[in-house]
């Protein structure tokens, strides 16, 4: 397991995806053999999300090392707030990927994190994640919390206060764990954060809460949106994009982040969700968006299912299938 996703390289699309497939699939196959009964199940296009998360490590870790660790003695931390088991299985064909947490740690091996904290509410998946990380990177300092993020975020944030720069990943399943009480303390921490934002789901929640607020369950949806977004301006949102903008604005205003960039991840079944990066490094955020978005929108990015079939030997070879655009 010695292949890493490197950021900012001017690779052709086929080279980029060959490297990414090797990295995520080969490491996923290796990690799956540890606690094989416990994996997370997603669609093929979750690979694009994992690429987005790992790619930012290529910007973040060397800069944090040179500008803060070496000069001022900072610790460099990685926090995965909804970490899962560390292995993803695709629903369509059962291919394995390494998850966001091992993917980020492997991508940072040249400038490794001093501190790694992962949160996984399912104790069996959390235990599998810990064993996988210990096997994969035995020298890495890793803490896994088997709790809801709302119960541990304050404690994690306190741990990150003293001379620590962090990269925080907030990658929920739809709404799970998406409360300001849970994610707000971490978004306030010094460093960068990446949030998976399910725009369509939040828009449906908003529409339901506005249309029938006399029902208790729908009232609860409205209260949840108010808690997450900071006020009831969501009621006036005229589109899903406007609702997303309200969330982004709150993070920028309340959490000492000065820039953001977002990448649209297409879903296999149609629709999309966003990967939103919050940072102070506006130029680097634009570079991240440019590089990753170009790959996702290429013919290769649009045909992840075919690439996985090639990788698994279910169709012709990768070099025969891929043509440079």
Predicted segments, located by residue:
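SAM cofactor-binding core of SAM-dependent methyltransferases
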Residues: 48-155
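A short, conserved alpha-helix within the catalytic core of class I
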Residues: 175-186
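A conserved mid-domain beta-alpha-beta active-site/ligand-binding segment of alpha/beta enzyme cores
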Residues: 205-274, 279
């Amino acid at each position: 397991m010695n292949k890493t996703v490197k950021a900012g390289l001017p690779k052709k699309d086929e080279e980029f995806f060959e490297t990414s497939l090797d990295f995520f699939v080969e490491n996923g196959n290796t990690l799956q053999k540890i606690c094989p009964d416990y994996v997370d199940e997603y669609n093929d296009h979750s690979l694009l999300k994992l690429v987005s998360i790992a790619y930012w490590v290529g910007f973040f870790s060397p800069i944090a090392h040179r500008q803060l660790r070496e000069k001022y003695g900072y610790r460099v931390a990685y926090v995965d707030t909804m970490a899962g088991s560390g292995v993803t299985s695709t629903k369509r064909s059962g291919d394995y990927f390494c998850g966001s947490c091992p993917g980020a740690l492997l991508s940072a091996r040249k400038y490794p994190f001093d501190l790694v904290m992962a949160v996984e509410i399912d104790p069996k998946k959390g235990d599998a994640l810990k064993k996988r990380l210990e096997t994969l990177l035995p020298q890495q300092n890793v803490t896994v919390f088997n709790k809801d993020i709302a119960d541990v975020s304050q404690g994690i944030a306190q741990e990150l206060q003293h001379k620590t720069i962090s990269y925080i990943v907030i990658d929920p399943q739809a709404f799970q764990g998406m409360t300001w009480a849970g994610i707000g303390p971490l978004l306030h921490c010094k460093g960068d954060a990446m949030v998976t934002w399910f725009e369509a789901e939040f828009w449906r929640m908003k529409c339901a809460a506005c249309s029938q607020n006399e029902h208790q369950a729908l009232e609860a949806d409205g209260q949840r949106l108010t808690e997450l977004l900071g006020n009831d301006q969501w009621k006036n949102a005229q589109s899903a994009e406007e609702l997303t903008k309200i969330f982004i604005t709150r993070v920028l205003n309340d959490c000492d982040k000065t820039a953001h960039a977002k990448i649209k991840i297409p879903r296999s079944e149609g629709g999309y969700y966003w990967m939103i990066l919050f940072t102070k490094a506006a130029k680097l955020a634009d570079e991240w968006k440019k590089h990753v978005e170009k790959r996702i929108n290429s013919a290769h990015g649009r045909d992840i299912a075919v690439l996985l079939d090639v990788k698994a030997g279910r169709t012709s070879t990768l070099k025969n299938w891929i043509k440079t655009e």
